[in-house]
Swiss-Prot record:
The keyword Cell membrane applies. GO terms for cellular component: membrane; plasma membrane. It comes from the Eukaryota. It is a single-pass membrane protein. Dual receptor for both endothelin-1 and the signal sequence of vascular endothelial growth factor A. Does not act as a receptor for angiotensin-2. Does not bind the VEGFA mature protein. May play a role in angiogenesis with a significant role in cardiovascular and neural development. Residues 85-127 are cytoplasmic. The chain crosses the membrane at residues 66-84. Widely expressed with higher levels in kidney and aorta. This is Dual endothelin-1/VEGF signal peptide receptor. It comes from Mus musculus. Keywords: Cell membrane, Membrane, Receptor, Transmembrane, Transmembrane helix.
Length: 127
């Protein structure tokens, strides 16, 4: 799969507020030229969008993407928790923190088995 990374724009096209319909058509034609490996029409000067190289741009793009994904995941989970019944959960920990109850462990460890002959002192002796 071939990917197209646009790293240059025609001079004067860097500001979106200046774009009008004709400029968008020209930019589209320029994109078609670069996409089909043709040469740009004469009179169009291309200037780089940034002084960074392609590896640096890809690296920054990846870090930005990951940061956005993490932020949206965190915000989404917070919104989900605040709008769900899970936020009204009244388990033992929440009751303890509110001073309503106390945490108890219902599991009881079985007693350790008694060692045979431990009290008579014969353990480990041979007869």
């Amino acid at each position: 799969m071939n990917a197209l990374y646009v790293t240059t724009v025609p001079k004067g096209y860097s500001s979106l507020s200046k774009c009008n319909h004709n400029e968008q058509d020209t930019a589209y034609r320029l994109w078609l030229c670069t996409h089909n490996h043709w040469t740009a029409p004469s009179g169009m000067r291309l200037q780089p969008l940034t002084s960074l190289g392609s590896k640096e741009m890809k690296s920054r793009w990846n870090w930005g993407s990951i940061t956005c994904i993490i932020c949206f995941t965190c915000v989404g989970s917070q919104l989900s928790m605040s709008s769900s019944k899970a936020s009204n959960f009244s388990g033992p920990l929440q009751l303890y923190q509110r001073g309503i109850g106390h945490i108890t462990n219902s599991y009881k460890r079985p007693q350790a088995p008694a060692w045979p002959c431990l009290s008579s002192g014969t353990m480990g002796r041979s007869h």
